[in-house]
Every structure is written in C-alpha cells, then in structure tokens.
Design a protein with these regions (language model features):
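C-terminal membrane-cytosol helix-exit motif in multi-pass small-molecule transporters
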Residues: 44-63, 251
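Transmembrane alpha-helix termini and helix-breaking/packing motifs in multi-pass membrane transporters
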Residues: 22-40, 103-108, 219-244
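Short amphipathic helix-loop junctions that connect adjacent transmembrane helices
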Residues: 99-116, 194
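Cytoplasmic helix-loop-helix junction between adjacent transmembrane helices
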Residues: 1-16
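Pair of pore-lining "gating" transmembrane helices in MFS-fold secondary transporters
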Residues: 76-104, 172-179
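Helix-to-loop junctions at the C-terminal end of transmembrane segments
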Residues: 31, 129-143, 229
Length: 252
C-alpha cells in the first residue's frame, strides 16, 4: 500500500540482504585458506543455481509500444531529460560503490581477506537492522524531500571516505554511508514505484528508459575514471561519486 510502501520496500531489501551478510565473511575465509580459485568456482555454482527457478516461470510475451527509434527519441527528448540525468547519475555512483570502493579496501587492508569479509559482513548486518527500523519511519515523510536529504547524506559520505586510512575508519564511514543509502534508496525506489503506478501506462517503456539511463551512466563514469586515474589517486573516484550523487536530485 502507498501508506506503508517504505516499510514494505525495507522488508524486501532486508530479506534479499540476508545471504549478502554471510557471503563476504565466508568468501574472506575461503580466500584466506584456499585463494581465489575456490571462491570463483563457488560463485559460478551459485550463479548457475540461481538461474534454475527461471526455467519454471510461465512464458509471457510482452510487446513495447515504442520501436527502437522511438525509444531513443524519447530517451533524448527534453521532457525526459531530468529523469535520464538522475538515473545516469545513479548508475555512475553504483559503479564507484561496486567496483572502486572494494578495490580501495583491498589495497588499504593489504589483502587481509578475513578482515575484509568480517568488516563487510558487520556493515551489512548493521544496515539490515537499520533498514528495518528506518523503513517504517520513512513512511511518515514526503518521499521527494527524503530523496533530497538522502543525496546530501550520500554525497557527504563519499567525501568522508576520501580520508579513510584504517579498518576502524572503514567501518565507521561505511556505517554512516549505509544509513545514507537506506534513506536515499528506500525513498527513491518507493518514489519511482509510485510514479510508475500513478502513470498507469507506458510502464515498461519508461522502465526501459530508466535502465538505459543507468547503463549509460555506468559507461560515462568508467570512461571518465579511466582517464583520471592516470593522474590522480583512487580516492578521486569518491569525489566524483559525491558530485554525481547530487544529480539524483534532478528526479521530480
């Protein structure tokens, strides 16, 4: 329901996060004992197993109202410019968070896999508890205002990460960033869901534009960072993420 949608999203995200708490701890232990090879094999097995349920899903045929040409025309249309810009920024920040922050941790902790796994697991566990608490609280406020607050918190979290120099700093900065992400993601995803429901038509088409925007953002940030890392340390990616995060505010 619209009234409890923030709480509902928090519960869904928390359920999906349960395995992600155990995974880094287990992966850290396996890498410390047997190296990357075993972890790679385990990851392959899990990935293949996760595809099995799709074999039992009923077949559905969805047709889009737009052609390829029309899709790109709507993608670049001035009317959708703010939405496209916001999702491109979201995709760009996702790359920094998923690729360059873990890479930074690897160098900072000097390949101490057990420590990396334990810290990551602790952060995810704290995030799960906080998400369940905050989700119910977020329903009391206007989603768009919370998105604005969430982008500011996330931007500041990225700037804080530029001064991280120890495992304790990693935990504290990541904990703060986890709270910021919960405020932003729960509010943003709830807002997007409500907008799609209110629109009532062209839902698949606008979902396609959203996904295109996110992936264009990923490509943009990778090209930008590839050039900048020749001249600046890895922490420059966090500054870029702090700037890009603010562009999520383009979403109305």
């Amino acid at each position: 329901s619209r009234k409890n949608r923030g709480k509902q999203f928090s519960v869904l995200f928390s359920i999906s996060s349960l395995l992600s708490i155990i995974a880094p701890v287990l992966a850290g232990f396996l890498m410390a004992k047997w190296g990357f090879s075993l972890v790679t094999v385990v990851a392959m097995i899990i990935s293949i197993a996760s595809m099995v349920p799709f074999l039992f899903l009923p077949k559905t045929k969805e047709t889009l109202a737009w052609t390829y040409g029309e899709t790109f025309r709507y993608f670049f249309h001035p009317f959708n410019r703010r939405m496209v810009g916001a999702y491109m920024a979201d995709g760009a920040v996702g790359i920094v968070n998923g690729v360059f922050w873990p890479l930074f941790l690897f160098f900072l902790l000097d390949g101490k896999y057990n420590a990396m796994g334990m810290i990551t697991g602790a952060i995810l566990l704290a995030g799960l508890v906080i998400r369940l608490i905050v989700g119910n609280f977020l329903d009391k406020f206007e989603k768009l205002k919370l998105v604005r607050i969430g982008t500011i918190l996330n931007s500041s979290a990225w700037l804080i990460k530029t001064i991280v120099v120890s495992a304790l700093h990693v935990f504290l900065a990541s904990l703060y960033h986890t709270i910021a992400i919960i405020v932003l993601r729960t509010s943003l995803d709830t807002l997007v869901y409500e907008k799609a429901a209110d629109r009532g038509h062209y839902i698949d088409e606008y979902t396609l534009i959203k996904e295109m925007s996110i992936h264009f953002g990923k490509i943009l940030i990778l090209v930008l960072i590839a050039g900048m890392l020749f001249f600046f340390p890895l922490q420059v990616t966090f500054i870029i993420a702090a700037v890009f995060t603010l562009f999520v505010n383009l979403l109305k």
